């Protein structure tokens, strides 16, 4: 139930947009589109240069100097290749490909559990995805940092609402090892306060009263009352429908809002799941 800040760097440069270029010949061109690249493609090499970040992409385009360069990229989990020829952008005085790329992401999430003996943690309840493309970010490295919740946009019909937070320190309190379908997982050497609790078996979870641990102000988690209305094994990422019945939480946030993902769900003294999505 403790909030944390996330800083994550991707494996390769993710294409998040395109921008046409005025070529020296007077025509408008887009080398990236001409090469068959699409939004959401992850560029991992241009020529002989591995594009681990945005600066490496710029370096690779400069190295090509208008010559055709092989581009290795990943689309839908499959590695592919194409050929791209950068053009000279006189206005920017540099070689360009006509694509916008992103190499990192940052945000706020909620811690689900920490195993104090093994020093591992889980949080967020869903993968970290790029805000423009919706693609899950391929993890190169990542860390979590202390965070404080400073405000909230209330959830309403058709609008999910959102917790707002700020990073309290640049000092990492944990390293992210996995950006998976059910959340982020990693290691930490920092002690977290909390209550030790067994994990329920699937058959022990039942519809009815339950609680969530969440932080909607400051840094301290609180327990709020919810009801588990439906249990399903059909979707491995969404096993329960949970309704907030706690008046204090409804007054402050309107229900589950973005940023509460990862909040642990408790029932009968056991950890039974985590908040993953907001219904709007």
Model regions and ranges:
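PDZ/PDZ-like groove recognition
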Residues: 2-38
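PDZ-domain C-terminal substructure recognizer with occasional recognition of PDZ-binding tails
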Residues: 4, 38, 58-98
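Short, small/polar residue-rich loop motifs at catalytic or cofactor-binding pockets
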Residues: 30, 257-260
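Conserved PDZ fold ligand-binding element
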Residues: 32-54, 265-268, 272-273
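Generic structural signal for buried aliphatic residues
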Residues: 43-44, 57, 69, 90, ...
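Short, Lys/Arg- and Gly-enriched loop/turn segments at beta-strand edges
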Residues: 49-60, 221-223
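Serine endopeptidase catalytic core focused on the charge-relay Asp
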Residues: 87-258, 267-268, 276
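Short beta->alpha transition motifs characteristic of CBS
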Residues: 273-280
């Amino acid at each position: 139930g403790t909030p944390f800040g996330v800083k994550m760097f991707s494996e390769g440069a993710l294409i998040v947009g395109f921008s046409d270029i005025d070529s020296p010949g007077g025509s408008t061109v887009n080398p990236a589109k001409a090469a068959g690249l699409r939004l959401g493609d992850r560029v991992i090499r241009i020529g002989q240069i591995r594009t681990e970040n945005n600066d490496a992409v710029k370096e690779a385009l400069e190295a090509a100097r208008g010559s055709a360069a092989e581009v290795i990229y990943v689309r839908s989990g499959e590695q592919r290749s194409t050929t791209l020829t950068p053009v000279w952008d006189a206005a920017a005085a540099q070689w360009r490909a006509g694509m916008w790329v992103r190499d990192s992401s940052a945000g706020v999430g909620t811690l689900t559990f920490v195993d104090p003996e093994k020093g591992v943690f889980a949080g967020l309840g869903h993968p970290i995805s790029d805000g423009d493309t919706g693609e899950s970010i391929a993890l190169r490295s990542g860390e979590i940092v202390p965070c404080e919740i400073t405000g909230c946009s209330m959830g309403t019909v058709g609008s999910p609402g959102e917790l707002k937070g700020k990073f309290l320190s640049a000092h990492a309190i944990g390293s992210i090892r996995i950006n998976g379908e059910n959340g982020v997982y990693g290691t930490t050497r920092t002690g977290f306060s909390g209550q030790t609790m067994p994990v329920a078996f699937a058959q022990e979870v039942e519809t009815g009263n339950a609680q969530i641990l969440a932080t909607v102000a400051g840094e301290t988690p609180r327990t709020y009352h919810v009801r588990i209305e439906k249990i399903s094994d059909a979707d491995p990422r969404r096993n329960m429908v949970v309704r907030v019945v706690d008046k204090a939480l409804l007054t402050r946030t309107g229900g589950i809002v973005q940023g509460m993902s990862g909040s642990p769900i408790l029932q009968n003294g056991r950890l039974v799941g985590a908040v993953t999505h907001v219904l709007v």
